[in-house]
């Protein structure tokens, strides 16, 4: 009898817990992290093996991933690139969600030489919009592509109007990294937090007025869709007033992460996203919009942001493990979407976990 395929999940943080718990139902899963408390949470609730591991130590990482068929890299962004490199050097297939600043394609030659599948940016955004772009670029002529995502709380307080729904360090990266987008086929670089606009949303039985601003979320799409989609933009949703508060922090030199910016995982939070495609099909104008609205899960206690990110990752992991996706080298999420059947499989996987993307087409 053939045993279950083995997976090692590096990182037992908010998203790492979701990933390990989801995969543990069908695979032999080990979670590696520095925190015994985080590992105990998993092992007490799910059939997950655990290993206390210093993920900043390359040798420790190499030892942790040795006996496995697939690695999930769910470490903080500042550790992501080097951790991914270590995984590839060890010849292990990997799905990564760490959202690091470096260019993942710098590891493409290494991954190919090691005969490794290295899927990167397989989270909520980047991630889910990219799968759709990869799929739809073969079905229509896309002229404009935009996605806006935000993790928020129903009841906000204070001038900041916001509590992080993921790592405060990674949130601050969004606010300080120059934002790149594409207009008429040309790369435009803008300051972060620039070009804010108010958007009214009617979604999930709620009405919101949110502020959207430029962030650097296109990432690999700048390469994979170059010359294929002439206009692309990514923005982030916050409640009105938050951007002005962040700018005041930056201008006055106040602490880069306020003390009260503790990631909040509670019943009050939600994640919202709007994805828009404009173009033509067979010479006729075509518009496709996707909307997603997800809240805290009372069954697992996992936050919406953790679930959407984690289940996007586990959807890709299943595509790799069952052979649906097999391209060697660095694979951004749009590559995965371009393989027939993969995007549909991932979104069916999300739907089965109550992550719903509503499609509106004209």
Describe each PLM feature range.
Residues 16-17:
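N-terminal Rossmann-fold NAD(P) dinucleotide-binding loop
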Residues 31-34:
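Conserved acidic E/D residue at the C-terminus of a beta-strand in Rossmann-like folds
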Residues 70-86, 100-104:
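Beta-loop-alpha module in the N-terminal Rossmann-like domain of NAD(P)-dependent dehydrogenases
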Residues 97-120:
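Rossmann-fold NAD(P)-binding glycine/threonine-rich loop
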Residues 55-67:
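Conserved Rossmann-fold cofactor-binding substructure of NAD(P)-dependent oxidoreductases
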Residues 36-38, 101:
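Helix N-cap at the beta1-alpha1 junction of Rossmann-like dinucleotide-binding domains, i.e.
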Residues 4, 138-362:
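C-terminal catalytic/substrate-binding lobe primarily of soluble NAD(P)-dependent oxidoreductases
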Residues 7-11:
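Conserved N-terminal Rossmann-fold NAD(P)-binding element of oxidoreductases
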